[in-house]
Design a protein with these regions (language model features):
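Histidine-centered divalent metal-coordination motifs
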Residues: 1-5, 79, 161
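Di-metal (Zn2+ and/or Mg2+/Mn2+) metal-binding site signature of metallo-dependent hydrolases
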Residues: 1-18
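Short active-site oxyanion
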Residues: 22-26, 96-98
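Short internal beta-strands
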Residues: 24-32, 158-159
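Active-site catalytic pocket residues across diverse enzymes, especially alpha/beta-hydrolases
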Residues: 13-16, 41-44, 90
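Metal-dependent phosphodiesterase/nuclease catalytic metal-binding core
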Residues: 58-160, 167-179
Length: 192
């Protein structure tokens, strides 16, 4: 497992405990994460006032929640390690959908599952000038993320997961806008 895929989870679990959470926490995660979190909690002599339910996912597309209010599907991504994206679809009167495609190479097959999504978050680790690095590391460029948004007929595209080599993130937005105009840079606290 890559650390940037889960390092925030132990802090979130601890925060929920400090705030007095009592309701079970369901964690849908890649295989191996339960072992890591359990080891971290044991070594830190940590505990929670609520139950952690781990649902370790295979590397495939599947429905994980389907009730009257929401449908949540996993999306099989293409990264150096097994990695899943997610599609969240509300079933209420005003249907809202959100696609989350984290670490993945350019994967046009995603477009069918993401068809007409309201908001698409897609990683764009590299600019197109470094597309050879994107291919090598199984990540995407801003151009490739924009192509996925365009082909899937997304309403909005949010770009994120930028390589630290880039200082000016507006270059990502400018690259993507040439293909998909309704593009934003992911910023903490921003509402889209």
């Amino acid at each position: 497992l890559h650390g940037d895929h889960y390092f925030g989870l132990p802090g979130l679990i601890s925060y929920f405990n400090l705030k007095g959470r009592t309701k079970d926490l369901n964690i849908y995660c890649p295989k191996g994460l339960k072992k890591i979190i359990t080891m971290m909690m044991k070594s830190g002599k940590s505990w929670t006032s609520y139950k952690l339910n781990f649902y370790e996912l295979g590397h495939k597309s599947s429905h994980i929640i389907d009730n009257e209010e929401i449908l949540v599907k996993t999306l099989k991504l293409n990264h150096r390690i097994p990695c899943n994206g997610f599609l969240f679809c509300s079933k209420e009167n005003q249907k809202i959908s959100y696609g989350y495609c984290s670490d993945t190479s350019y994967l046009p097959e995603l477009c069918e599952s993401l068809k007409d999504v309201n908001i698409l978050y897609h990683e764009s680790t590299f600019l197109s000038q470094h597309d050879y690095l994107a291919k090598k590391t199984k990540h995407s460029t801003a151009t490739e993320a924009a192509k996925i948004a365009q082909t899937s007929n997304a309403n909005k595209l949010i770009l994120g997961h930028f390589s630290a080599r880039y200082k000016d993130l507006n270059k990502f937005k400018n690259e993507a806008i040439s293909i998909f105009s309704n593009t934003f840079i992911a910023k903490e606290g921003q509402v889209y």
